[in-house]
């Protein structure tokens, strides 16, 4: 591979790493996720067990679990300023029906939503301020209730005047026969 995959210059990849770290480094979130199989003193273990950097809908399983899943989307550039774009962080919390009740007097999906909102709403941790746009309750099936939070931020748009695709940039096109020389790739 000729691309430097270890140093990806992509704001979504970078921000998703930060979002995941912010979630699993919050001890209250780890406690409320309530996974007795994992050590709360090693919160990074919760990543890809209870916290996912993509929307993962739980399937049929033997053990009841709770999940925080998230995705980050680029939306259209600002119509007034092409150097800026809107990004949306969507957090979907799934709580198994057997784990909804908590010792804190709030339903687990509502409590997790409160904690997530507390971490991200009006936070500048991803560069520019995140603003909560919606907080909705729902269900997936007979086993899981959900809470979906959507945050918006306006952030700089990529304004790179050159291509970063090394396969395309390093290729040589011979105009006579339109063959692509990829020997340097």
Predicted regions and their residues:
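Functionally constrained cores in energy, signaling, and assembly domains
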Residues: 14-16, 27, 49, 74, ...
């Amino acid at each position: 591979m000729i691309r430097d995959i270890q140093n990806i210059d992509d704001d979504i990849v970078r921000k998703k790493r930060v979002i995941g770290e912010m979630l699993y480094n919050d001890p209250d979130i780890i406690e409320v996720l309530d996974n007795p199989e994992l050590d709360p003193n090693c919160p990074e273990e919760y990543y890809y067990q209870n916290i996912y950097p993509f929307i993962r809908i739980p399937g049929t399983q033997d053990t009841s679990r709770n999940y925080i899943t998230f995705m980050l989307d680029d939306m259209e550039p600002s119509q007034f300023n092409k150097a800026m774009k809107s990004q949306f962080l969507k957090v979907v919390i799934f709580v198994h029906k057997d784990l909804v009740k908590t010792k804190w007097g709030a339903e687990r999906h509502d409590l997790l939503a409160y904690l997530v909102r507390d971490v991200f709403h009006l936070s500048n941790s991803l560069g520019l301020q995140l603003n909560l746009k919606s907080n909705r309750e729902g269900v997936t099936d007979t086993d899981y209730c959900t809470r979906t939070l959507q945050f918006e931020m306006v952030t700089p748009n990529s304004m790179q005047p050159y291509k970063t695709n090394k396969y395309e940039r390093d290729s040589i096109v011979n105009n006579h026969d339109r063959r692509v020389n990829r020997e340097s790739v």
